Amino acid sequence: MRKLTKNTLAAAALTLLSHGAFAQGQVNIICSVQAEWCNLMSTVYSRTTGTKVNMTAKGSGEALAQLNAEKANPKTDIWFGGTGDPHLQAAEQGLTLEYKSPQLPQLHGWAQKQAADSKYRTVGVYLGPLGFGYNTELLAKRKLKAPQSWADLLKPEFKGEVQMANPASSGTAYTMIATLVQLMGEEKAFEYLKALHPNVSTYTRSGTAPVKAAARGETTVSVSFVHDVTTEAVNGFPVGSVTPSEGTGAEVGSMSIVKNGPNTEAAKKFYEWALTPGGQQFGLAAKQFQLPSNTQVPKDPRMTDPSKIKLINYDYAKYGASAERRRLIARWEKEVQNAAR
């Protein structure tokens, strides 16, 4: 293990001791963050509590589909991570348990609001602003300036040079559409998306695929959460990031307890641990740079400071509603996805 991971293990163990979280048993978790983050949490929690952790990695859209599929007989106890909109949809559909953590006052306001908006059926665990990633070598080779705004992405020099995900499968891409609708108004947002379409080479299934393509030199620009760009830069790839000057949205990565899951008490113990400062160090240990929701977690300088960028007043309750999500995605599929380039 790296030194950071060892320190994280020690901090998490002390947290577990102070919270009296030692217990045998089992907890079944769907994890919608990066694989190493999931694995670190699973390993440390299992070692220090004796609890058997069954961890399955799924994207947020797939996770919501699984919870719906098994709602008559839930197999899952906890859903950790992924964009907050699907968690709000799960809450709306009665798939998750109302649970008000005593640690809520320690969390940032945006994490508390996520809990309140869901009637305490989910909670925010991290914040990640939306922006652009770009390959610095490709920009230099093509004598292009890095995009600084949503408007810049429409420039003809970026024709076929942009990748973004498909909002039907990606929370990242849905966050982009919802952000543009709130920033521009719905009609102008869809005019923008149609104008952007010729510049998009492909709509990927995964929200992280575009920035990985930019890192490998397969595309010049990605629409991504900026923390995913930072991860690629830390791993040595020639990428940079920016948040658009007109304003942008952010994901509130969330955590939910599944209603009528097989191990509800074990789920509550894990949930409480995952909200502690010790439990929130695993993202950074896995080279992930979202802002943790617990205010007592030291902020790494590589994390984007929300106070230093132009964030819109994103309406998570409205755009996290199932009907609104379905409507906007259906409109995008009809008007944008299959339009001529």
Question: Which role fits each region the language model picked out?
Answer:
Residues 85-89, 215, 220-238:
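A ligand-binding cleft/hinge motif common to bilobed small-molecule-binding domains
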Residues 315-341:
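Conserved C-terminal helix/tail region of periplasmic/extracytoplasmic solute-binding proteins
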Residues 97-106, 122, 151, 237-249, ...:
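Short beta-strand->loop
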Residues 192-197, 203-204, 235-259, 295:
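Periplasmic-binding protein-like
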Residues 24-89:
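Early extracytoplasmic/lumenal segment of secretory-pathway proteins
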Residues 258-316:
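Mature extracytoplasmic/periplasmic domains
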Residues 33-39, 75-218:
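Extracytoplasmic ligand-binding site segments that recognize negatively charged/polar headgroups
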Residues 133-138, 178, 252-264, 282-283:
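A bilobed periplasmic-binding-protein/Venus flytrap-type ligand-binding module shared by bacterial periplasmic
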